[in-house]
Amino acid sequence: MAASTKYPLVNKIRQSPPVDLSIPYDSAWLKGKTILITGGASGFGAGFVRKWAANGATVVIGDVNVQKGDSLVRDVQKETGNNSVHFVHCDVTDWQSQVNLFKEAVRLSPHGGIDTVVANAGIAGEDPLQRPGKLDAAEPPKPDFRIIDVNLNGVLYTSHLAFFYLPRNPGSTDCNTSSDPNANPRDRHLLLLGSIASLAPIPIQPQYGAAKHAVLGLFRSLRSSSFMQGVRINLLCPYFIDTPIVTTGARIALAGGALGKVEDVVDAATRFTADSRILGRSLVIGPKLNVRQEENGEWTLVAKDPPESQETAIWEAYAEDWEDSEAFCRSLVRVLNAFQKTRGWVGWAKDIIGAVGYGLGFIRR
């Protein structure tokens, strides 16, 4: 039987090659960048702030916790000598609150724009979805879907605003795999925070699992078209990391296993943020393991320090989405490329949208 023909689209969507973690990046590439982080007052966000401020970035933190945010800014300014670290109160579930955060970040930016947006805000906690209350009640009370509001709707607001502000970043150009991160700090980068719950089921937390699956879906969709705005997008999917979001119950459930380290998440995020050549890639961060790659590409857990083994906490996920494609995706990407080149296809696009809408049942006479 003849081998099937593949239709790779990685070049068409401007996706960079798989991340080679053996190649070092330079944290000094962060100097002069302006970075906006939602949920930046604790956990991963605080780790990002400390690392990036120490390397000369202007960092604007948006968080609902004023006390933690103000305290973090004071500490980081004192530790690093970088006074370009700012806190802005922001409720990511409130549209206008996020708009105000972005506007303030632009105002505080030394060059009047934003280079990287990090959609980091997220919460976990008791999930009432499967607990409707007393079954003999006349009617069920309205459930609290705050986890969805923060972890999904908040991320959608952040992403939408990123696509408004990043292309307006003065001095920035369209994302490019051959850009020189050492020559120009200007960037257009959206970094999404998923989770291991983006990739695997998580019991007792249906809202959290649904939201993080949605963030993965958002990333996989956006990376196929964000080049139209010249924006590069990347995704982090941390395993259970030693932060306050991992509850006591979760720690008990993980007893005997291992938690990942914040510094590994910060390292992966810093690679993405510093290196403007990385486009459309996702990394999973877990506990450090000793592994060896087999001939078929699969990884095998091995004892420490055997021949050809390596210690790593970072893995690439969904690396092959666009190594092959089916007809609809090929056609769509061709359309997007044509749009970027000509900007003159409005009437034709209406026909295409109408045809797709008809096929999906939205438009029927």
Question: What label would you give each PLM region?
Answer:
Residues 12-15, 20, 235, 252-347, ...:
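C-terminal helical subdomain
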Residues 23-60:
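Canonical Rossmann dinucleotide-binding motif of NAD(H)/NADP(H)-dependent dehydrogenases/reductases
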Residues 54-55, 200, 209, 217, ...:
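Active-site-adjacent segment of SDR/Rossmann-fold oxidoreductases
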Residues 66-67, 88-103:
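The beta1-alpha1 cofactor-binding region of Rossmann-like NAD(H)/NADP(H)-dependent oxidoreductases
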Residues 107, 113, 122-148, 171-184, ...:
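Conserved mid-core segment of classical short-chain dehydrogenase/reductases
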Residues 159, 211-212:
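Active-site helix of classical SDR
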Residues 195:
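Residue(s) in the substrate-gating loop at a strand-loop-helix junction
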